[in-house]
Design a protein with these regions (language model features):
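Carbohydrate-interacting regions of secretory-pathway proteins
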Residues: 1-212
């Protein structure tokens, strides 16, 4: 799309985007994965990597469905930031461990990684795990329903969707974007209900019954 171009092996956001426009998405949808990428922001820059984004006409912008790994130049950002808006957060949901964050200066490359493994989520920054949480738990829903996403009923519910980079009005560069898809884990099923032999069929002449 117009705000994006390729220069010297990097995807670059020109900085022409806004909250309502300026996104680029993958053709393919992903479910469980390890996603890593290098990124570099302009001074005071703001961007993000979103996943499980649902593309439907009723969703005007990607972030009303897709969680976001926030990318931002905190020291030079022109406005005060809430904790849930800062670098490495699961935007407006979960906060990273600041003691584990080692950020290269603005204008230099940093590396980030998202792991989404059957609802277990990790955020990494420059080789350090800075955040992990479980999606769709009671705590997750409490955060969703009491904060920024209270009026975004479909936020974070999709288990599969496209990846999305954000041009939020600041030039940004991305390279070495790599993904490894992870297997879907089968849900454990209880084969005996403890009450009767439903789901079982007698084989042979023996009599089977339920006791205790």
């Amino acid at each position: 799309t117009q705000p994006w171009h390729v220069v010297d092996g990097c995807i670059q956001a020109k900085g022409d985007g806004s909250d309502a426009s300026g996104y680029i998405v993958t053709d393919k949808q992903y479910e469980n994965f390890e996603l890593s990428w290098d990124w570099k922001l302009s001074k005071g820059g703001n961007s993000g990597m979103l996943y499980h984004v649902v593309e439907r006409p009723q969703f005007a912008v990607p972030y009303v469905t897709g969680p976001e790994y926030q990318l931002i130049d905190e020291p030079n950002f022109p406005e005060p930031l809430e904790e849930w808006q800062k670098l490495g957060v699961d935007y407006a949901m979960h906060l990273p461990d600041k003691s584990k964050m080692k950020v290269n200066p603005q204008g230099e490359w940093n590396n980030s990684k998202i792991v989404f493994d059957n609802g277990h989520v990790e955020h990494w920054l420059n080789g350090q795990k800075i955040l992990e949480f479980e999606a769709w738990t009671d705590d997750w829903y409490e955060k969703k329903n009491s904060g920024k996403w209270a009026n975004a009923p479909e936020y974070g519910l999709a288990k599969k969707g496209v990846l999305c980079l954000q041009d939020h009005g600041y030039p940004a560069s991305f390279r070495n974007i790599k993904i490894k898809e992870l297997p879907r884990k089968s849900k454990e099923v209880n084969l005996f209900n403890g009450v009767d032999l439903k789901g079982w069929e007698a084989y042979g002449t023996e009599l089977w019954y339920v006791k205790d």
